Swiss-Prot record:
The keyword Ligase applies. Its main location: cytoplasm. It catalyses: tRNA(Asn) + L-asparagine + ATP = L-asparaginyl-tRNA(Asn) + AMP + diphosphate + H(+). This is Asparagine--tRNA ligase. Keywords: Aminoacyl-tRNA synthetase, ATP-binding, Cytoplasm, Ligase, Nucleotide-binding, Protein biosynthesis. Homodimer. Belongs to the class-II aminoacyl-tRNA synthetase family. Its EC number is 6.1.1.22. One of its GO terms (molecular function) is asparagine-tRNA ligase activity. Gene3D superfamilies: Bira Bifunctional Protein, Domain 2, Nucleic acid-binding proteins. Pfam families: tRNA-synt_2, tRNA_anti-codon. Signal peptide: none annotated.
Amino acid sequence: MSIASIASVFKGDFAPGTEITVRGWVRTRRDSKAGISFLAVYDGSCFDAIQGVVPNALSNYNDEVLKLTAGCSVEMTGNLVESPGSGQAFELQATAVKVTGWVDDPDTYPMAAKRHSIEHLRDVAHLRPRTNIIGAVARVRNCLSQAIHRFYHENGFIWVSTPIITASDCEGAGEMFRVSTLDMENLPRTDAGKVDYDQDFFGKEAFLTVSGQLNGETYACALSKIYTFGPTFRAENSNTSRHLAEFWMVEPEVAFADLNDIAGLAESMLKYCFNAVLQERMDDMKFFAERVDGSVIDRLQSFVSSDFAQVDYTDAVEILQNCGKTFEYPVEWGIDLQSEHERYLAEEHFKAPVVVKNYPKDIKAFYMRLNEDGKTVAAMDVLAPGIGEIIGGSQREERLDVLDARLEEMNLSKEDYWWYRDLRRYGTVPHAGFGLGFERLVSYVTGVGNIRDVIPFPRAPRSANF
């Protein structure tokens, strides 16, 4: 007798006639007049539940089997047989059903069989993985995570764990969560009346990181090709479907690379990940296509078969100004493109993923390489049909004098970035990288529109439960 995951059963790892045990939770119970119960049991290893055919001859049939409700946990043993029904290939002719956990009150169980709105499920985030939609999201999220690591490993990258606690603001935006052990009820003060951070844990101000990029650059300038994959934090007071206070970022960094190199890397990585989902998680993708967004499978298949278009920011602005469409946000050179502009370019003009390059320097970060025109930087965004921006990146400024001028221009302290400047003083090299918001990627793949529903426990303004 083997302990089997339901996914392995449906993959054909066990021949008909094999005695197996599956462990999981009851999704539904249906009783027939012939004295047989049909239990749909799932274990999360795949989308489908397996049907157990349970005869009334079992010793605990009346006392336990007939009392099973959605959410009860069971171990079901039996002989695997080909299913006569059209719903699935196999079912289990049960010879034993062991109840390992009851639902206290089926009438108040939040995950009972009836359908719930996805908004309601956020209020019961500790139980929502038991639903079809969140379970499917979790498996696709895992598939994408594994694909990212495989892609970079196969391409010679080294995974670097960058710090979560930092003293530097990568984006220069100041929207950071402070980390402190000071007594908030009795803050130490300097003679000038300001908070005395010399007495804090690190002896200075410290924050949760907004990006691993700057730290990642230090390793790229020694190991050539690295990537980071971890949590990042933004204290933006944005209550939208596109923003989280805590989210995950994928950030590769490549020495001796320019903007075109990382645009190609971004295209290869996205196509690799989407192919992995289409090959490994088609059961979940069919659910998303049926219940969430009918275009998700076609969209991914179209994406992986398309060549990325490329356009300069200046030309993109001209396209938008001359397209005859009225946008909510008027288009002029120097603005940061809004989602409506990005989606028009990807969905209506190019009808393909598009890389927009060479943005005005005044709307981009200090570390992006200044172009020869003195007005733009070697920055890029990858825009995807259906969502807009999915990746942002740049060639980094490797010239110390230009970097210093940019820091000064943006009123940032050179002293705060002394270690970052050292990279330009000791064997500087051209290098480039990008950032991919992982939840935005999961949202794009699944069609689930709000990124609070594609991370296990969302953190957002006024929301830090569980």
